[in-house]
Amino acid sequence: MSAMENRKNSLHGSPNGLSGLNMVLPREGDSNNGIMTTEDARNGKLKGDKDLNMKMHVGMGTTPINTRLGNTMNSDVANSMSYLLEQPQSGTLIGDRLILETSEEPVGVNLVDGQNARNNQQMLNNASHMDPAFTLPADDTMNNSAAAAAAAAAAAAASTGPSQPTMQSTPSISTGGSTNFQVQIAQRLADIDQRILRMEMLMDNVCNKIDSHSQQQSLWKNDMHQMENKVIDVLDEIKSNIFSLKRQVSNQGDGAFAAELINAISNVSNKHIRKNTYGFPAGNPQGNDMGQTMNGYNNAMQLSSMAAPMSYVPGEQVNLNQLGNSKDQIDRFLTKSANEFMLDPSGLKKRRKNPSSSNESPITLSHTKTHSTSQPINYSASLPNLNLDALSKVMLPQHQQLTHNGGSQHPLSDKSIKFGISSTSHSSSNSSDSDDEEDDIDDEEDEAEDEEDENDDSRDVNDHDNVEGRETLTKKSMKPGNSIEGRDPSGTNGTVNSTTNNHMNTIDTATNTSSQLQGTVIRSTADTENPKQESNASAAATSGAATGVATGTTTANIATSASDKLKLHGDSKKEPKFTMIKAPSSVKEIWREYTQGIDGRPSIKSLDQKFGNKWRANKNKKTYSRRKRMYKFILNGIKKGKSEEEMVQMLENKRIYKDSDGNQKKRTIGWLQQSLSGI
């Protein structure tokens, strides 16, 4: 209960507006420890609550105090005290001093020693301060001893009667040294009371603020829970979207792989079909030329066989007739040479677009039954690997036997032409040539402009060699002194002349077809690379040897031409076959290999300057053509004024990229080479 509420029960009845009463009450104890207690009676109650009522303990002397005030007032009071009245209901505290509405100074009641007992009695009996018949109001909180003391004080005041003078109301005047001390204590207590009230108000404010903060925190907590739920929902939605995107990407990747697999299978099958095409399409000029050449050669062979006496070549004539008339033998050969189709697993790694593969003509065999019976069937034209070289190698031993054994009367043994074996061997060689041609097609697609320059150089060399070979063959075939007559040392002119006449009948026919044969050989060797040039050159030398035999050339000329070719081949072997590094880790390593060389090997730049394009092995051509793009890129930058390090770093920076997670990675050297394809 606050002090303002306590003031509502304070006593009233003083004409000066005093609303409180200071009462001196005895307390049990010995004479040495007698304690006088002053209770705050502003609310008319005597309580023991020290928190709500001010209490002051003052020593009043050594003489025991009786319960009657009259005896005390006579001579037992040894010290005088001045008690401040409590703050009235209508007053205020200014400067820790009590100020009433009718007075500017605090009002007090003086209690003096025994000499002024009369004045004290008059003060107690004065009606202006307290009525002798006054009794404290009954209250449940008042203890019995306090009520008895109050009643005793009232009775003592009434018993004195009017004989004692009336005590006048005077201002508080202290007559002893302890009075100021007690006044200061009272002022301090009032100040403490005021501060306690202020502290109570501050505590109330603090409690209110704490309550408001707790409510605000509860609201914030609810908001945080709602926000957390929203964030969780958004994260779940994002995860579901990412999962769906990954599923779509995986599905697309599977579809793309299936499409690439189908394309690879189609490319491999088309390559197999091209390798096993046995007929010559009508739109292929090379095939038409080869067919005409083979027809002329067959006609020449027929004329030579008809001109030769049957007595000398009984077995050969039978075999030639069997070769020309046995269709079943050629069918068996074609069936045997047609390999079973098998999917090449390496074809998946060589995926490339071939739009023209779908427009290829169907497989046609020229030995079908569409030929007329009146015309001779040229079965050799339908053979895929049968060429002039094979026929010359097969027919050469028999003609040599005819020329060497012309004077003898011993019958020749029946030796059939091993057509299947020789053609099969050439089939394997030509199939490897066709494989090389397919690889060359792939190389040309990747090498672009670089391989075109190399092919131009190789064509120039091939043309020069073929022209020389053609002139040599023509000169040898046209020499009039190269006859078989000089070969016969025995002097049997009749036999020698007959043999010479028989073979001379075929010279004109062979001469007429020589230009066609030479043109075919030149065209076949013009579009191939160095290894094929050597094989075609050897084939041309062999065909020249066959022509020389037919026209009567000596074996010395054949040996000379063969030795020339072997010498040329030996010179080519002296050229270094350099192997480039595989799987380089950086552009800097590739450029160092080009300019300086790696591991003590010569640089690629020096090899190009010294040997041209002949230092590279076949497996290095494709690698060199791709890396040459980077060489050109760096060299072009150097021409524009930039340094080698800047150009190399530019290519390295081009490889850098970021993946879907933001991690920095590098693409491969192959990707970088492919990106520079336009250079």
UniProtKB/Swiss-Prot annotation:
Residues 1-49, 344-379, 402-546 are annotated as: Disordered. Residues 39-49, 458-474 have a biased composition (Basic and acidic residues). One of its GO terms (biological process) is positive regulation of ribosomal protein gene transcription by RNA polymerase II. The keyword Phosphoprotein does not apply. Residues 355-379, 402-411, 503-528 have a biased composition (Polar residues). The keyword Flavoprotein does not apply. It is found in: Nucleus. Signal peptide: none annotated. InterPro entries: HOT1, TF_GCR1-like. Its main location: nucleus. GO terms for molecular function: DNA-binding transcription factor activity, RNA polymerase II-specific; RNA polymerase II cis-regulatory region sequence-specific DNA binding. Residues 433-457 have a biased composition (Acidic residues). GO terms for cellular component: nucleus. Residues 422-432, 490-502, 535-546 have a biased composition (Low complexity). Keywords: Activator, Nucleus, Transcription, Transcription regulation. Disulfide bonds: none annotated. It holds the Pfam family GCR1_C. Required for a complete transcriptional response to osmotic stress. Belongs to the HOT1 family. This is High-osmolarity-induced transcription protein 1. It comes from Kluyveromyces lactis (strain ATCC 8585 / CBS 2359 / DSM 70799 / NBRC 1267 / NRRL Y-1140 / WM37). The lineage of its organism: Eukaryota, Fungi, Dikarya, Ascomycota, Saccharomycotina. The gene is HOT1.
